Amino acid sequence: MTLSDDTPGPLLASGRAADVFDIGGGKVLRRYRALHDGVTYETRVMRFMFEQFRAGRGVHVPEVFDLRPADDSGRDIVMERIDGVTMLNDLEQRPWKLFSHASLLARVQRQVNDVVAPEWMVTPTTAAATKRRDDSVLHLDLHPMNVMMTAAGPVVIDWTNASGGPAGFDAALTFVEIRTFEVSGLSNQLGLRLFAAAFKRARGSGEIDAFAAAACDHRLADARITPGERANVGALRKQVRVRKSGRTRPQN
């Protein structure tokens, strides 16, 4: 098998837009299913964050490796294989870790946001009207499925949406994503609400409330969310609007 094959190795994971294959030698291939003009940017972000991690800042991210020109399809990223389970998988096996994992997610996100965004990193208009010199690195998709739990500690994956901006926006978007994920079953729905509330307390309610409306708008602008998630975000957006008018107390 070669990197140009449709199936370059055993399939390890599948997301909404990409698949991850084991290509041996401690490496994996992340392949987008369609031509993706953000691959170069995502690779640059990951390399930047990996260098920050090696310098003692930020969080552990997979190391990215060069592709040969002949293998570069515009859809692929070759990176270090991370052995472990996602935080979500760990929660499914050990639900009693809910509160400690929510606190860990908040701590990991702070470590991401402690890194100052370089000038070349984009800033979404939903996060801020203009770019600032002291903007933080924002992951903008940091939830339990994008944190790998390993023997060496948490590793953050999937940097597709990474940007620069105010740290509170990243925190609010994580809260909105977790709070509005589409899941079946009353126990799963209750678990999500508990996790979202615990994350909000650990990350800072005031910071999240300040950016909650913008985070909802950012999420609603994402064409990839499911109809159920769109309905959930819309309902949360209405709650935020009511809360801002002062007619009710903050919602967890």
Residues of each region from the PLM?
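Juxta-kinase regulatory segment immediately upstream of eukaryotic protein kinase catalytic domains
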Residues: 1-7
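ATP-binding glycine-rich loop module of kinase domains
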Residues: 9-42
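AlphaC helix (C-helix) of the protein kinase catalytic domain N-lobe
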Residues: 42, 46-49, 109, 174
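Conserved structural core of kinase catalytic domains
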Residues: 65-107, 128-129
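Helix-rich C-terminal or lid/interface subdomains of diverse kinases
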Residues: 84, 104, 173-252
